[in-house]
């Protein structure tokens, strides 16, 4: 894929960039694999905002993605590569030999017409899925399971890739895109290769309206609010926050403070925390 820039004729397009969508081969999704999802817009079942700065945005159809890759031993051919409005990665439509169709995350370098398979002893080729114990050291993978059979949860964003750095006993050591190094069972499955659309990280939004298309609302700074709305609020004119450190609207340390809970069961699996 590539990035397309606009000629600088308006403030909204001066620094804006978009994908050229050169890898997309089909415009309409597979109807049997799409359905409507009622978006929560940051509200819970009582209508109370639980996640701020969400709402609006363009309507979307959800594409059902196969994160489990559990059609063992049945080869599939890549039919199309499509755009998915629900993620920054592209998706690939697979036609299996038994007639079933499924979407997967599009791995970088996988083309229409390529054949892939999920198998215990599948060749270590881009797009194939197999257990971590059968992938050699240094191998690059994505869509990695945390629990065997639970479906891929790690390294699923555009351009994401995890690397196998060690194997010991029934555990495999992975270096994740965040910089975290953690242990995973060698029975967990993963897909070989890197997620496509690697230039997604280099996109420049360019204008506020484009964020609204994505369903993201303005993020108002606490320092410009009233004291009743935020701990940073109040004062005459432009005032400092008046505290030793920045805090959230609920008084919790923010802006750099680590928020992971201590003494979690998974701490023993994390060898090095994320950067």
UniProtKB/Swiss-Prot annotation:
Residues 225-275 are annotated as: Disordered. Keywords: Chloroplast, Plastid, Ribonucleoprotein, Ribosomal protein. Coiled coil: none annotated. Disulfide bonds: none annotated. It comes from the Eukaryota. InterPro entries: NA-bd_OB-fold, Rib_uL2_dom2, Ribosomal_uL2, Ribosomal_uL2_bac/org-type, Ribosomal_uL2_C, Ribosomal_uL2_CS, Ribosomal_uL2_dom3, Ribosomal_uL2_RNA-bd_dom. Belongs to the universal ribosomal protein uL2 family. HAMAP family: Ribosomal_uL2_B (MF_01320_B). This is Large ribosomal subunit protein uL2c.
